Amino acid sequence: MRRLMSSLMWGPIARLAAAIVALTGFAMISTNVTAQQPKAVKIAVIVPLSGAWARQGQLVKMGAETAVNEINAAGGIKALGGAKLELISGDAGDSAEKAKNAAQRLIAQEPDLVGGMGAWLSTFTLAITEVTERAQVPWLTLSYADTITSRGFKYVFQSSPPAGVQSTEAVPTIVELGKAATGKPPKTAGIIGDNTASPVSFLKPMREGGLEKLGMKVVLDETYTPPLSDATPLIQKVRSTRPEFLLFISSTISDLKLGLEKMNEFHLAKGAIPVIGNGAHMGAPEVVKNVPPELLEGVMFIVANWGLKGQERISDLYKKQTGEPWITQDGLAGYGHTWILKEALERAGKADKVAVNEQIHKLELKSGPAADAFPGVVKFDENGRRVGAPLVIVQWQSGVPVSVFPTDRALAKAKWPKS
């Protein structure tokens, strides 16, 4: 009887002990698996998310988010054991001071950042990169100002052709497009530009004899501070001088809207005077929501990137994830810059900002998502400028902004507006 009672007592105890051992073992295995999960790698995007340039900043951020989702879904950073990318965002706001403060805060709060991108407006980018350079955080930007990569910085990379290069190459190209369509080149030109860094850089060669060298006389040259409250004084001068084409270089959609509406009121729109702009905001989806398509028809603008042949996969992925009707330079830049950081991390083999910076300097990408996101090769010179970065010319046609140059990759042929 005593043996029977002992057996009955020890049976449950033994089973309980076995269960505890099994659970303990499972917990140890689970803890071990968790411990082996690689730490997320943090990258930053600082763009305007409030103020006049918020929409453009949102497009950049959405492009970066599209790339992060794609990279993480495909297994993350393979050289780091499948570590996921984590995108940390900061709001550059509506001034250079706010942009600089955003960079200082983000870097202080996230000391393990390995790289970043932003800040859309060149004036903001100049301020932010003063901070990121000191912190040795590699920074990729689509901003145009020549001064961004002429300061001797080692941690700044400009994927766009600088504004000076764009203006030097773009206007002759556009003049030839006009000549091919009308049979004669324009003889007079007008200039209206705001006083932010990129328009100033873009127009500098034109104001210093570039247009005269092309056989054109500058009959109007006006500078203003954005955003405009009333475009009447500027457009009255366009009406009185009647240039054969107008360089309208603004950094805000609201200024473009006011300018085109006033030109229409004065019977100068719809091709009466061809308008050429600069910057991706001129092709943002909301432009056509605010400006009648007939006023936009034929308007051309110069960018560093737009939807081209060979970018269909990226465009479709972006549109599916964001719900946007088309991909702009901003979305392509956010996507492409993220992939550049991914490629540099794979080559560095560690989540270290200095090592990532060294690898970006060594990149020469001709294929893959990072290369597909940009026209031309992804390779940077010692100053951080992308080598041979070509410009892209876009034109509003039937309510949609389509690439018309370079002609071998463009999605449409250029149409010179006619009066």
Label the predicted regions:
Residues R2-L4, I13-T24, A35-S419:
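Extracytosolic ligand-binding ectodomains
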